[in-house]
Amino acid sequence: MQDTTANQVAANATSSFTEHLQRNRPGLLPYNQPFPAALTGAGSQPLQVPHATTIVSLTYGGGVLMAGDRRATMGNVIASRHIEKVFPADSYSVLGIAGTAGIAIDLTRLFQVELEHYEKIEGTLLSLEGKANRLGAMIRGNLPMAMQGLAVVPLFAGFDLPVGIGRLFSYDVTGGRYEEKEHHAVGSGSVFARGALKKLWRPGLTAEEAVAVAVESLYDAADDDSATGGPDPVRQLWPVVYTVERSGARRIPDHDLASVAGAIIEARTTARREA
């Protein structure tokens, strides 16, 4: 009896936690939740739910960095000034989310469990390419929700240990995966953030310089995009910033970000810059 049970467990074993849920409890997947026809049918009004906005990522001399603002919007209303949109996926990769906040955060948690499950089953880390591909498959699974207006568009970045460099990947709503060089941004303020990144980024940045570039690009995005929140000295709210190097992922402390944001604001005030 015990041997039979063990054989059944072995036969159903998979290194993918998402695949395990799909086989056994598909209703637990974030994108397998049915919506009433009144909410999704023809002529229905779009759901008013919080949306996460701008994420930026860039490579530098020692690895890769990702940063996100702290604002979530719901139509023309600020839904939150405290939301976090950048998360560690595992010890050597980070994930930033733009789009429907609730679904994006659930997908992030599922992705974190997916990588942890793989490591426990296989006894080794999944390669960076493998992580990027699995995230793409999850986004593709969310396509029916995206077609109902509940899209999730992530940025993924990590340190490729065998190669010894930081890499970053963007996605579309169908799960298409695209490796980006140098820097990238997603979300409502991404057009303005990319413009700033093009001017500020250069090869061989130090980690400190990369943090300053990321914060200033978010500052520029917030200046022109009402859905993006800039550094807020009054509330002491700063972007969420992670660096990923050979030593692993690390969150930049708020006191460091306060100094960086303060220097940017002071420089622009001194220069009397209008924009």
UniProtKB/Swiss-Prot annotation:
Subunit structure: The 20S proteasome core is composed of 14 alpha and 14 beta subunits that assemble into four stacked heptameric rings, resulting in a barrel-shaped structure. The two inner rings, each composed of seven catalytic beta subunits, are sandwiched by two outer rings, each composed of seven alpha subunits. The catalytic chamber with the active sites is on the inside of the barrel. Has a gated structure, the ends of the cylinder being occluded by the N-termini of the alpha-subunits. Is capped by the proteasome-associated ATPase, ARC.
PROSITE patterns: PROTEASOME_BETA_2 (PS51476)
Activity regulation summary: The formation of the proteasomal ATPase ARC-20S proteasome complex, likely via the docking of the C-termini of ARC into the intersubunit pockets in the alpha-rings, may trigger opening of the gate for substrate entry. Interconversion between the open-gate and close-gate conformations leads to a dynamic regulation of the 20S proteasome proteolysis activity.
Single GO term (MF): threonine-type endopeptidase activity
GO BP: any one term: modification-dependent protein catabolic process
Gene of this entry: prcB
Name this polypeptide is given: Proteasome subunit beta
Job of this protein: Component of the proteasome core, a large protease complex with broad specificity involved in protein degradation.
